Amino acid sequence: MELVGWLVDKGITSEKQWIQEDQASYISFNAASNSRSQIKAALDNAGKIMSLTKTAPDYLVGQQPVEDISSNRIYKILELNGYDPQYAASVFLGWATKKFGKRNTIWLFGPATTGKTNIAEAIAHTVPFYGCVNWTNENFPFNDCVDKMVIWWEEGKMTAKVVESAKAILGGSKVRVDQKCKSSAQIDPTPVIVTSNTNMCAVIDGNSTTFEHQQPLQDRMFKFELTRRLDHDFGKVTKQEVKDFFRWAKDHVVEVEHEFYVKKGGAKKRPAPSDADISEPKRVRESVAQPSTSDAEASINYADRYQNKCSRHVGMNLMLFPCRQCERMNQNSNICFTHGQKDCLECFPVSESQPVSVVKKAYQKLCYIHHIMGKVPDACTACDLVNVDLDDCIFEQ
């Protein structure tokens, strides 16, 4: 009984973990004649007790208080990307304790080498049982997610075949899934962590992409955008750092807003350079000097016009040219498809002396974009073309 209790407290489920934790005790138990059967029985009993009586916070939250958290790698990654570590830690703690109800998923989004997989891998390996989503196998994608403490969805995509089951799992609902060579099994509410550099709210159906499930999927997630690349010697997040981070979060809990985008703030800014570090710029000879563009008309910043951005432009504050993928991602929220924003001042200019009112048109037929969106626009050139009557055309007469 003492051995099983020790295995449960340490979260040990295999002989390899036992050797790594306490090699001397493993050798002493392995020295007896019937040791193999005792070791196997103890590990099996410990696994059953953990799966039935323990949850993820029992192994994610450390026992000892943390005095200095500034050297923690998870803390550094969040601070580097502009997040308030205390607020972000409260999001992670509430996610692990299933405090947010339907919002049961943390989505770490960003390009490669930004630390998203580093964080997710460390959290998954800290708990005794975690499952991985095999999105490449559309018949049994959640085969490994039954009776787990944490579910990890690594670099996946959302397809039309699995979206309904995925919404139930991401929302913390009980759902039965098919298993290979077995009968269907029930997945209980389990915290889910997703890492990807693609849009997980866009559903791929063959060679087409739809956004009809975007809002339901966003209602089930907290999204962290990690855009700052880490140094090559940054290192891996350890299990102890995960426990220290969650323990620090438990001791410094703040109120969390239930919203898709986790708000940023509280990051440290780099100090301004001193006068001694600023050198006088070199003068360009008049014969090769180019005209300055400061007096020219400012170019359009498309970064301000896109509410949702693709993986190539998610961290950009300045976009000089439009993006076709960003246009598609904003079609369900923007009216002006030419510039990608709702209130386009170029298409609908407003003067203080003589404001211009937008003329609303009534359409009997809608273009394919507004037909999919299910909204009637105030004005749309594509809808104008659809509603043209060829009998009224001079050339047809």
Curated annotation (Swiss-Prot):
Gene Ontology biological process terms from the UniProt entry: DNA replication; viral genome replication
Keyword tags: ATP-binding, DNA replication, Host nucleus, Nucleotide-binding
Claim: NAD is one of the keywords in the record: no
Location of this chain's protein in the cell: Host nucleus
Main location as per UniProt: host cell
Record carries keyword Nucleotide-binding: yes
Top-level taxon of the source organism: Viruses
Domain SF3 helicase: 84-239
Region spans: Disordered: 265-296
GO MF annotation list: ATP binding
Binding site for ATP: 110-117
InterPro entries per UniProt: Helicase_SF3_DNA-vir (IPR014015), P-loop_NTPase (IPR027417), Parvovirus_NS1_helicase (IPR001257)
GO cellular component, one term: host cell nucleus
Subunit structure as annotated in this protein's UniProt entry: Homooligomer. Interacts with host PRKX.
Function: Plays a critical role during packaging of viral DNA into empty capsids, where they are thought to be part of the packaging motor complex. The single stranded genomic DNA is packaged in a 3' to 5' direction and requires the association between viral DNA and Rep40. Regulates host PKA activity by interacting with host PRKX as a mechanism to interfere with helper virus propagation and to promote its own replication.
Annotated protein name in UniProt: Protein Rep52
Organism per entry: Adeno-associated virus 2 (isolate Srivastava/1982)
Lineage, top ranks: Viruses, Monodnaviria, Shotokuvirae, Cossaviricota, Quintoviricetes
